[in-house]
Amino acid sequence: MILKRFFRLSGLKIALLSILAVSVIYYLDPDFLSLLELKTLDLRFHSRGKIVTTGEVALVAIDEKSLDELGRWPWPRVRMAQLLDALVKYEAKVVGFDIVWAEPDENSELKSLSALKQKMNELKLTNRDLEKYLSQAIQKADTDRTLADSLARSRRAVLGYFFHFFTKEDLPKEKKQLPKDLPPLSTYNWVKYSSQAAAKVPLFEATYAEVNIPVIAEAAEGAGYFNIFPDRDGTVRWIPLVIKYQDKHYCALSLAVLQKFLNNSPLVLRLAEFGVEEIRLGDLFIPTNEEGRMLINYRGPQKTFPHYSATDVIHGRVPAKAFKGKIVLVGATAMGIYDIRVTPFDHVFPGLEVHANVIDTILKQQFLYRPNWVTLFDLLAIIVLGLILGIILPKVKALWGGLDRDFSFFRLRPDLQSIIPETRDLGEPDVSSIQSCPYLSDDHRLSIHD
């Protein structure tokens, strides 16, 4: 008799079992629910549509038109120097390159001249006029030096590079080291720890760096990595703002460019026991998750930011004030030579424009983030709603219960346009907490940070 009573289902028991089941699902975070959450976030982006940018960012694209007029990619370093010199004339405040020059430029003329000079030295042939001519010719033929000179003259260029994340077994035999004199803007100016344990928090840690050759790296004002890690469905929604390498903390290209744009404002990283607590760039606060990843508030589909063809810039066919006082990002967008990304707006999206969205989001301080209290709120919602559904609703007549649920659906579920007005930020809807009540609005996950 006691066993029968124990196993007899009641509203309270059903509620407790439901709460337990949903709590376990919430804790385990199964893939299908995570993917569903990500897709609902994408739907919210589409519903919100395009939003106004700061107008501080412009893109110079190495596109099909540029390749048709100036030749196939990769371009000689002299061509890139011409492009940078043109942007200086247009008075761009900062020029960021979504490009890495990791190897010396292939130059047959330079090799021939260097070989001739070496042969003269071996044969002990002396001719001052010939030696002077060869030295000048070698200097002129050294396209790496030509680009480096252009970078140094501009005093506004920030370079890109990237990290590899090999396992120890897959590391190359000769591990490339970051140059000791890598521009300091590549790292955080200050890293502050809340405790000794905070110094050991796991972050994205690279094992190999693909950096620019020294002659070019030393001439720039800074350098930032352009690594981007897509979500499990292949869509880019987040960007890592800090990567650890050889006991130093490096910043993304977007942050390095912004730092130069904001007159070298200090870049500060605060670490706590749980991970990244805070990132600040001068007076700008940048919310991230514990891994140091920022959720990108995409301004819209591709070409939301003004695009200009590199060949038009070189040939002076761009309006005079197109780049004045602005951040200019340079990178490839021609089919076959650029990194294709999938974003909530487009399945084909240039990686160059991802960096533009990150920069504009930070400048406008219009972030998408999940407050720390949301997890507690979700658990409380699971418990409260589970008890309501298991105890109160069974006591309500079926007719009135059905009407009440229908009414709650229309009352608590406004149309998507009202969920995401332009002045509000998007949060990540948590599907598992909604399971305990099919009609729960997810408005509580929207967070505003103005």
What are these regions (language model features)?
Residues L271-V318:
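Substrate-access "cap/lid" subdomains that shape
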Residues S254, Y308-T311, L426-E428:
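Helix N-cap / beta->alpha transition motif
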Residues I2-L284, A320-F410:
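Non-transmembrane functional regions of envelope-associated proteins
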Residues L403-D415, S432-C437:
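Small-residue-enriched core segments of transmembrane alpha-helices in multipass membrane transport
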Residues L17, P429-I434:
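Membrane-embedded hydrophobic alpha-helical segments
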Residues I434-D450:
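Juxtamembrane or sensor-core-proximal signal-transducing alpha helices
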Residues E353, V358, S432-Y439:
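C-terminal, active-site-flanking charged/polar segments
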Residues R413-E428:
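Transmembrane helix-loop junctions at the membrane interface of multipass transporters and ion channels
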